[in-house]
Amino acid sequence: MTEVKQYPGRDYDVIVVGAGHAGSEAALAAARMGNRTLLMTINLDMVAFMPCNPSVGGPAKGIVVREIDALGGEMGRNIDKTYVQMRMLNTGKGPAVRALRAQADKHAYHAEMKHTIEREPNLTLRQGIVDGLIVEDGVCKGVITNTGARYSAKSVVLTTGTAARGKIIIGELMYSSGPNNSQPAMKLSGDLERLGFNLERFKTGTPPRVDGNTIDYSVTEEQPGDPEPHHFSFETKDADYIDLKHQLSCWLTYTNETTHKIIRENLDRAPMFTGVIEGVGPRYCPSIEDKIVRFADKKRHQLFLEPEGRNTDEWYVQGLSTSMPEEVQQRILHSIKGLEDAEMMRPGYAIEYDVVAPYQLKATLETKLVKNLYTAGQTNGTSGYEEAAGQGLIAGINAGLRALDRGQFTLKRSDAYIGVMIDDLVTKGTNEPYRLLTSRAEYRLILRHDNADLRLTDKGRELGLIDDERYAAFEAKRQAIKNELDRLGKIRIKPNDEVNAFLRAHNSGELKDGVLAADFLKRPEVQYADLMKFIPAAPEPLERHVIEQVEIQIKYAGYIQKAEERVDRLKKMEAKKIPDRIDYDAIDGLATEAHQKLKKIQPTTIAQASRISGVNPADIAILSVYIQQGRIAKVQ
């Protein structure tokens, strides 16, 4: 075969490889910071595409979308423009686990994000496949495409998703492919291995799509959206919320014993169990055949029928991810209530792909092996659009900062769920597709859906990603919260017939002495609206998000204070830095596993070292003493 002749392409400040959810955020962030940015994608028709579930948000993930928005990212704005249904989850639980979820119009989501990218002044969007990196003396200086173009840059971000040596599997059928039958990237992985990177093989899957006209909705349970307005972005107005009658419902059905029997009888043809699939699959989103085997005692499993958009009849069968042969998939579908006559439009499939083992990354998402090279998204072993977008934003910010010769940006575990995710990846690594869960965050009471803007907008502003108008609106909100908290901390409520009648009606103890309005509001049965019956209203009408913050900050004050005290203790450990190029071989007394893990992961602080699996408190004590005594290897 004739070798493709290389030629010099344009020079850029930042190049982003891959335009999925990670790549889109990375490129927009870098460009908005003033960098001339190139965004390369295998297919222009798949920018920010949703090859799997047509939704954004959910537990932990919805909070990540709010964090992305607070930092100046795009996902929140984009889904607010393109959703077909919006629901707040876990409303019966505390604020720490509440999460917003939107059903997306997947085609509108792609089109809107592509349009946003095309309008960005510093950003060039181009179709092409990157086959290799330009690396000189351990520094990444650009990329080489399959057409021979050599584009140079000050920093490069890889967000290749599931395209890296992608392989689709449907029963006995296997072929090289990216997601949704797109072209795979077959050469870049080899180039990374040549540079010394350790790559792993992961697997994910997707369910069949069915024709919505052939679903019998009458025997399923409707799952409508919420009538009250919600949105992911600080910038979106309540007035823009789609009223309930114009939202699209999802529908709930279940597998049954017949479904399970069909699956069990065909396990000998299931790639998951025949050894065909080598990649490690996601623990928290298993295939239906995996669920039937692992949870053999369960009589049924939930399935949600979800619309893929307003202008398509394709419906997504959430919970039925599978790589079984096509004919078996059809039999499975027809065994399910409401899908007895469903026409399958696309079969489900599994896809294997390459992953950069994330212990090879810094908290900035720059690789330790190659300077100025960053990776984000499924490339780093995560699953989910939101996890990808969060990483993409951080990688794009840092690639942009590097191009501007400015210091790097990181988020701590106490700052954001994004910080929890990145710390988990770079400190612990992952042996399966990583999914964010509220249980992964030890400070989840202060990492809430409702306070993402209060936590992170200042940081977004410092990075140049929050404009003047938005920041002024944010400051007005923050000041309104402070003013009302101060006011409620000064006004007293005296016991009287009206107050005590209210308390008796709510089975609450009567007042014998006067109390501060803030203390009155701390009672579980008292809401802010109730409080306003007994005290004057605020001087200016308060927006509902201000009232929500006031109520949460007062009612959960004690718990929040305890969480903040734990954060302060963590900060002291984070302040204890581990010098670069420390020689762990020279430290006597470390346990063998701790020695191996510390040497492999190279933590930057004592706090990070303490979170590494296999490193125990005794090892941390030895390491701390070693550093305090100044017995460290010299930086070369």
Curated annotation (Swiss-Prot):
Its main location: cytoplasm. FAD binds at G18, A19, G20, H21, A22, G23. InterPro entries: FAD/NAD-bd_sf, GIDA_C_N, MnmG, MnmG-rel, MnmG-rel_CS, MnmG_C, MnmG_C_subdom, MnmG_C_subdom_sf. Its cofactor is FAD. One of its GO terms (cellular component) is cytosol. Keywords: Cytoplasm, FAD, Flavoprotein, NAD, tRNA processing. NAD(+) binds at residues 281-295. It is found in: Cytoplasm. One of its GO terms (molecular function) is flavin adenine dinucleotide binding. The keyword Cytoplasm applies. It holds the Pfam family SAM_GIDA_C. GO terms for biological process: tRNA methylation; tRNA wobble uridine modification. NAD-binding protein involved in the addition of a carboxymethylaminomethyl (cmnm) group at the wobble position (U34) of certain tRNAs, forming tRNA-cmnm(5)s(2)U34. PANTHER family: GLUCOSE INHIBITED DIVISION PROTEIN A, PROTEIN MTO1 HOMOLOG, MITOCHONDRIAL. Belongs to the MnmG family. Homodimer. Heterotetramer of two MnmE and two MnmG subunits. This is tRNA uridine 5-carboxymethylaminomethyl modification enzyme MnmG. The gene is mnmG.
